[in-house]
């Protein structure tokens, strides 16, 4: 589906130069001389390689037709995951590499979003927010205001994140998975 270059947005998938690319970020530029263009950071969905591309604002790009389907995580091993479609209960197996480094967030019965292009799975995403328990946290010295207001903590999945000083071992916190950061203390 052809779309104007000016309408490119992060999160879209483009069919560009014979490959599928995820638009990571965009910036509209209007130079003093010449036509406006969109500077886009693209990620190749097959290889994972990122690169910069310029699109004319008044030109056209091919947007890939993508279908998003929700699947429930059932079980997995080091190389593949078995998932169940939440609508028709069909089970499929996908390589764990489709999740990349976000596979550490997998939890039993978690709902994943799979992206399909022409019947093939091209990408998988964990939810944006995941609740995890803090298993290790640095101690904070009272009145310590000269240094950063965050401390390092280790989560139950082994991931290390920065958390506010009031977070203690055993507490559950919400992690924003796209950038692996603390979001808030989990509500009971």
Swiss-Prot record:
InterPro entries referenced in this protein's UniProt entry, alphabetically: Elong-fact-P_C (IPR015365), NA-bd_OB-fold (IPR012340), Rib_uL2_dom2 (IPR014722), Transl_elong_fac_P/YeiP (IPR020599), Transl_elong_KOW-like (IPR013185), Transl_elong_P/YeiP_cen (IPR001059), Transl_elong_P/YeiP_CS (IPR013852), Transl_elongation_fac_P (IPR011768)
Main location: cytoplasm
Pathway: Protein biosynthesis; polypeptide chain elongation
Disulphide linkage map: none
GO biological process, one term: peptide biosynthetic process
Keyword Thylakoid: no
Cellular component aspect of the GO annotation: cytoplasm
Protein function: Involved in peptide bond synthesis. Stimulates efficient translation and peptide-bond synthesis on native or reconstituted 70S ribosomes in vitro. Probably functions indirectly by altering the affinity of the ribosome for aminoacyl-tRNA, thus increasing their reactivity as acceptors for peptidyl transferase.
HAMAP family, A to Z: EF_P
Family indicated by similarity: Belongs to the elongation factor P family.
Name of the protein described by the UniProt record: Elongation factor P
């Amino acid at each position: 589906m052809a779309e104007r270059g000016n309408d490119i947005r992060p999160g879209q998938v483009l069919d560009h130069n014979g490959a599928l690319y995820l638009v990571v970020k965009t910036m509209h530029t209007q130079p003093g001389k010449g036509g406006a263009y969109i500077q886009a950071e693209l990620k190749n969905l097959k290889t994972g390689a990122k690169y910069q591309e310029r699109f004319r604002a008044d030109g056209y790009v091919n947007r890939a037709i993508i279908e998003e389907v929700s699947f429930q995580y059932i079980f997995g091993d080091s190389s593949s995951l078995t998932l169940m479609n939440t609508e028709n209960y069909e089970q499929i197996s996908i390589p764990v590499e489709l999740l990349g480094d976000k596979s550490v967030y997998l939890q039993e019965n978690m709902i994943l979003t799979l992206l399909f292009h022409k019947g093939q799975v091209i990408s998988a995403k964990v939810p944006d927010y995941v609740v995890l328990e803090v298993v290790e946290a640095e101690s904070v010295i009272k009145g310590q205001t000269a240094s950063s207001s965050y401390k390092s903590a280790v989560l139950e999945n082994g991931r290390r994140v920065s958390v506010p000083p009031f977070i203690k071992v055993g507490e559950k916190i919400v992690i924003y998975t796209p950038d692996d950061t603390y979001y808030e203390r989990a509500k009971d």
